[in-house]
């Protein structure tokens, strides 16, 4: 199992830093070393950047008026992610090997799970209790290649953003 901590990069940025392991705060994460990835979110797009060499691994662009579908390009391929349903906060995506995954979000829990097409839990995201700088902790249950990890990280960030917006709008 692999564990990652996700933190806001700063107070006035939409970027998220991804560190290995679970950390109490951003300072302890930074003391242990450089972030592995940075997820940048813009109004109509997202990027996953490997921090060690500033290489963009995955670029996503929202499609349509409602922004409920995203085209994702990276690793020499393109795929799509889309909202799991009209009134649902979860998202689905197809990886670069044509396997389907779904983020399942519970409105009564501070965590959500990523399942594969067979219903197996592949990853779990648990939101931080105090949501000042830490978004939460992502646990990836089994070894995955970097392409699938990139898709997991970006779609987890999309779901986190949607859940946050839903809470702020009272939905």
Language model feature labels by segment:
Residues 1-36, 41-43, 87-91, 96-171:
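Low-complexity or membrane-interfacial segments used for flexible interactions
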Residues 32, 53-55, 74-78, 96-100:
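Glycine-centered tight beta-turn/hairpin loop motif at sheet-sheet or coil-to-beta transitions
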Residues 40-70:
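Acidic, aromatic-enriched beta-alpha/helix-loop junctions
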Residues 48-50, 71-72, 81, 95, ...:
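Short hydrophobic/aromatic-rich beta-strand segments that constitute the beta-sheet cores
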Residues 61-90:
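Helix-adjacent hinge/juxtasegments
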């Amino acid at each position: 199992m692999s564990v990652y901590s996700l933190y806001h990069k700063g107070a006035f940025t939409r970027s998220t830093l991804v560190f290995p392991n679970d950390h109490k705060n951003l300072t302890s994460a930074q003391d242990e070393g450089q972030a592995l990835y940075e997820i940048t979110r813009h109004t109509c797009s997202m990027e996953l950047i490997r921090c060690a060499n500033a290489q963009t691994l995955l670029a996503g662009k929202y499609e349509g008026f409602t922004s409920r579908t995203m085209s994702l390009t990276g690793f020499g391929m393109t795929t799509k992610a889309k909202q799991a349903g009209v009134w649902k906060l979860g998202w689905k995506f197809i990886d670069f090997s044509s396997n389907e995954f779904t983020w399942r979000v519970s409105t009564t829990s501070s965590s959500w799970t990523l399942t594969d097409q067979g219903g197996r839990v592949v990853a779990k995201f648990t939101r931080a209790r105090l949501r000042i700088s830490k978004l939460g902790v992502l646990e990836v249950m089994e070894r995955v290649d970097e392409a699938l990890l990139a898709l997991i990280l970006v779609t987890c960030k999309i779901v986190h953003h949607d859940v946050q917006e839903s809470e702020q709008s009272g939905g």
